[in-house]
């Protein structure tokens, strides 16, 4: 397949996280152009707006007929496709100040409910990501988020994107995850995270990711090596199940099948589109 790849992955976007993200090696990237890899430092934040900007840049410069958007950040993909509101540009110092304000809240959801019942009603109390994003808007603009979004409506994504999903039999998927965990540990996952955890702020976004957060717990002696391997195996299995449900219910997927079948479907679809 003559294509380029856009990585919609919230861990591969970071420099220096290579093992935990199972990022393609430089050798694997040599003949195939990849976008949105190694873009951020560990102490920088990723979000849907950043991925949208990078995706639009990639679409503009890609020389291939096919640009494959690959990765597991389905929530970001949904946000991009449905449209995003413009958010004000802020400095690193302002980000730190806002993070401190939010961290100081005893109950972020209760506070959001008190300043903006309308937006709080639309967010589940356990949806920490969306609660956090709403509070960021409030502290940044001093407006209730619902009013801000009314004044700054979502801008739909201007490009047509066809969605394909891989189907992997449950036992095969679980075995793949178990083997990947062993490979990561053997390749130096703990050493990779140890070096980064010593260098960057402990509340950096990547340290909350699956595979990374468990390694941090091991480094803090809260997990044994056996428990670490079990956690890095079990948590991705749970995540894969959630992602599968999310993808089925939130997207209009054109085709689902094996790697070979999806490859054939993409080629067939791309030919009919031109």
From Swiss-Prot:
GO biological process: tRNA modification
Cofactors (names): Mg(2+)
Alphabetical list of InterPro entries matching this protein: Dimethylallyltransferase, IPT, P-loop_NTPase
Signal peptide, first to last residue: none
Pfam families, alphabetized: IPPT
Record-linked Gene3D superfamilies: 1.10.20.140, P-loop containing nucleotide triphosphate hydrolases (3.40.50.300)
Broad class of enzyme this protein falls into: transferase
TM regions (residue ranges): none
Region of interest called Interaction with substrate tRNA, as start-end residue ranges on this chain: 9-12
One annotated GO molecular function: ATP binding
Family according to the record: Belongs to the IPP transferase family.
Subunit structure comment from the entry: Monomer.
NCBIfam families reported for this sequence: miaA
Protein name: tRNA dimethylallyltransferase
Provenance organism: Helicobacter pylori (strain P12)
